[in-house]
């Protein structure tokens, strides 16, 4: 028989202290299969009225609702809640409050590297890979398991320059610029140098834990990391393999 409730744990972080609540989600009817975001919204309405979390589109478009569910990053608006699920903030970024993490330091890595945005004509002639990369919703789930992002320890909330090392998201943005037909040839060298300065080389030895496909279906190894490694170190790799 289907139950009318789901029992979940929500981990909260406030004032540098962590705590957790056991929350019993009340289904609207026994057949309901709520998303984790539905659970958070009900918990906020009925139990913890200042529970903090982010959401926007509720349709896998904006990427801001990402939380860890049982230790793995998921979009809360798209993940079905199950009995005994544990919901916590993304482990890869510093917590601001409850389930809200500080996101802006990641994009700060790329300040000054989108000089061509004003010339954008939507690139209807660009190849398929370019358009695949525009599908990134910036959910930051790809930080999980990244050997480079792990080096950014300690993750400091108040230091805007706390992330000297890159991650699949940053490299995706650089690769998209690199293959953008509007990027002048003379700027491509700067893009590769930026990728190198963020530690791209680490992936030559260690990217086995990197997610292959992200949540919106971008193949991070084939469409982002491999082509960047090829552009940055293609000669050396070929020589090594001879
Ligand atoms: S709320 Fe926009 S992706 Fe989940």
Residue ranges and their predicted role:
Residues 34-46, 90-91, 95-242:
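Ferredoxin-type iron-sulfur electron-transfer modules in oxidoreductases and energy-metabolism complexes
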Residues 2-103, 143, 147, 152-155, ...:
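Iron-sulfur-associated redox domains of electron-transfer enzymes in respiratory
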């Amino acid at each position: 028989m289907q139950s009318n409730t789901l029992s979940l744990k929500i981990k909260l972080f406030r004032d540098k202290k962590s705590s957790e609540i056991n929350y019993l989600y009340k289904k609207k009817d026994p057949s309901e299969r709520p998303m984790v975001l539905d659970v958070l919204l009900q918990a906020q309405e009925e139990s913890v009225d200042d529970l903090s979390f982010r959401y926007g589109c509720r349709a896998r478009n904006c990427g801001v609702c990402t939380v860890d569910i049982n230790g793995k990053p998921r979009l809360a608006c798209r993940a079905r809640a199950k009995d005994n699920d544990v919901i916590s903030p993304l482990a890869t970024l510093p917590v601001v409050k409850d389930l809200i993490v500080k996101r802006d330091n990641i994009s700060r890595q790329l300040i000054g590297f989108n000089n061509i945005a004003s010339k954008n004509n939507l690139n209807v002639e660009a190849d398929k890979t370019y358009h695949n990369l525009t599908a990134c919703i910036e959910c930051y789930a790809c930080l999980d398991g990244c050997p480079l992002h792990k080096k950014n320890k300690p993750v400091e909330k108040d230091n805007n320059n706390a992330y000297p090392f890159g991650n699949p998201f940053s490299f995706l943005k650089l690769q998209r610029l690199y293959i953008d037909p509007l990027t002048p040839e003379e700027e491509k060298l700067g893009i590769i140098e930026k990728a190198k300065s963020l530690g791209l080389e680490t992936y030559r030895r260690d990217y086995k834990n990197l997610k292959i496909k992200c949540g919106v279906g971008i193949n991070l190894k084939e469409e982002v990391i491999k082509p960047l490694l090829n552009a940055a170190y293609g000669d050396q790799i070929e020589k090594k393999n001879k």
